[in-house]
Structures are given as C-alpha cells and as structure tokens.
C-alpha cells in the first residue's frame, strides 16, 4: 500500500502555456481573460487571443527596436519617452497608427520651416556670365 495522496507512477508531463505553444512572449491567457471580461462579444474563439497577442507583441517589438535605435543615436543606453516619440513620429506607418496619441515627456520633432532658414547664397565662380 502506498501511503500518499499522489499517484504512484506520476507520468504527467508539465503543462505547456498557450504562449509557449504559439512561440510568443506575451501572455495569451491574460489576453483571453481580458477579452472575456471586456464584453466585446458573447463568445471568444480559441484562436482570437493568440492572434491578438501576436499582433501586440509584434507592435511592441517594432516600437522598441526603433526607440532603441533612437536612444543609440543619442548615445544613451536607456530608452526614455523622448526616444519613443522620435521613433513613432519618424516612422510613417506608426505615425499614422498613433497619430492622435500624446506621449508624456515626449517633446516634439525638430522642424524649422523652410522660409525661416537663411537664403542660400549663389556661388561666384567661372560659371557666371560676364
């Protein structure tokens, strides 16, 4: 007689998360729970949270890569809101997607109107007519 509550030959394999099955880092289970609690629809399919999670992970990776490049260009090792702002506003598609989003402490893009710049002087040289 075995004297424990567990099974004698525990051949159960460890459970694999849906995130691991899909090869994702973001939590599929949490997104599924939020979709159910959010009353977006009466029923949520099993593939919907996986797809949404993969889209969110891709967008986050894209923004963080561009922000990391902006931080490196400014010789910084830490991404700050300014770097996020520069990354989003300099990318045409991300700027369109997040056009009406305000990033706190993001600042503005450096831009000087063309009419405010000093006029370019014509070169004096051999090419001028006499």
UniProtKB/Swiss-Prot annotation:
GO molecular function, one term: DNA binding
Pfam families on file: Histone (PF00125), Histone_H2A_C (PF16211)
Post-translational modification: Phosphorylated to form H2AS128ph (gamma-H2A) in response to DNA double-strand breaks (DSBs) generated by exogenous genotoxic agents and by stalled replication forks. Phosphorylation is dependent on the DNA damage checkpoint kinases MEC1/ATR and TEL1/ATM, spreads on either side of a detected DSB site and may mark the surrounding chromatin for recruitment of proteins required for DNA damage signaling and repair. Gamma-H2A is removed from the DNA prior to the strand invasion-primer extension step of the repair process and subsequently dephosphorylated.
InterPro entries (UniProt xref): Histone-fold, Histone_H2A, Histone_H2A/H2B/H3, Histone_H2A_C, Histone_H2A_CS
Superkingdom in the source lineage: Eukaryota
Subcellular location: Nucleus; Chromosome
PROSITE patterns xrefs: HISTONE_H2A (PS00046)
SMART domains in the record: H2A
N-acetylserine PTM sites in chain numbering: 2
Cellular component annotations (GO), alphabetically ordered: nucleosome; nucleus
Keywords: Acetylation, Chromosome, DNA damage, DNA repair, DNA-binding, Methylation, Nucleosome core, Nucleus, Phosphoprotein
Record region (Disordered): 1-22
Role summary: Core component of nucleosome which plays a central role in DNA double strand break (DSB) repair. Nucleosomes wrap and compact DNA into chromatin, limiting DNA accessibility to the cellular machineries which require DNA as a template. Histones thereby play a central role in transcription regulation, DNA repair, DNA replication and chromosomal stability. DNA accessibility is regulated via a complex set of post-translational modifications of histones, also called histone code, and nucleosome remodeling.
Assembly behavior: The nucleosome is a histone octamer containing two molecules each of H2A, H2B, H3 and H4 assembled in one H3-H4 heterotetramer and two H2A-H2B heterodimers. The octamer wraps approximately 147 bp of DNA.
Name of the protein: Histone H2A.1
Species annotation: Lodderomyces elongisporus (strain ATCC 11503 / CBS 2605 / JCM 1781 / NBRC 1676 / NRRL YB-4239) (Yeast)
Organism ancestry: Eukaryota, Fungi, Dikarya, Ascomycota, Saccharomycotina
